[in-house]
Design a protein with these regions (language model features):
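Alpha-helical structural modules in large enzymes and assemblies
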Residues: 1-207
Length: 207
């Protein structure tokens, strides 16, 4: 309930003097995620790179090539479009990690073919992106996919019209406990095999 000067908060308090300000838990969760991402260098750089890949693949010529590669490599599966990132809607980050993970092989192939077949700025951009997409990138992609999937589930529940303050507080508390368990567990070891398999399937740099 924002707008303490002239918005909804002020008008409600004129009618109900004991009403108190409650920040939207869904928005509050987004603010925390945004702050963390901006203040952790690895996270900030990772999501910046993910956005650069999205922008690159959105070019009309490149986009058509990306779709063609998907049809060839995954003929029986649905085409996946990469997701634009947003500071205010972190479900976009979760979706972006999900789709990038599913189509990582296609993305790497797209960058390789563009850097080899194109000329000028587009080829240079492809080589620049490809040089940054290494085993660490894959590890972070898998890590954020796992973490953001948990957070996104809670974010969606917070948007439920029937949710009240008590339910919101309980959801956030459970999420904090879940993330603490992840931090204290061997999460990296648990999915290291998946990361290793991805790295084996993808040769990042041109020989």
């Amino acid at each position: 309930m924002s707008g303490g000067i002239s918005g909804a908060q002020k008008h409600i308090k004129e009618k109900a003097l004991i009403a108190y300000y409650v920040h939207c838990y869904g928005h509050k969760l987004n603010l925390v995620l945004t702050s963390v991402a901006k203040n952790v260098p690895q996270a900030s750089e990772f999501f910046s790179l993910l956005e650069e890949v999205y922008i690159f693949a959105s070019n009309a010529v490149v986009h058509e090539k990306f779709l063609s590669i998907q049809r060839e490599m995954f003929p029986e599966e649905q085409i996946r479009e990469l997701q634009h990132l947003s500071d205010t809607r972190w479900c976009c980050q979760a979706t972006s990690c999900d789709k990038a993970l599913l189509r990582l092989e296609c993305i790497i192939r797209l960058l390789k073919e563009t850097s080899a077949d194109d000329t000028g700025a587009r080829a240079a951009s492809a080589r620049g992106l490809l040089a940054q997409m290494d085993a660490e990138f894959v590890c972070l992609l898998q890590f954020f996919f796992e973490i953001l999937r948990k957070i996104n589930k809670v974010s969606q529940q917070l948007q439920d019209k029937q949710a009240d303050l008590g339910k919101a507080a309980k959801l956030i508390s459970c999420l904090r406990e879940d993330l603490a368990d992840v931090r204290n567990s061997n999460l990296i070891e648990n999915y290291s095999n998946r990361v290793d398999d991805l790295c084996k399937n993808v040769t990042f740099h041109q020989q």
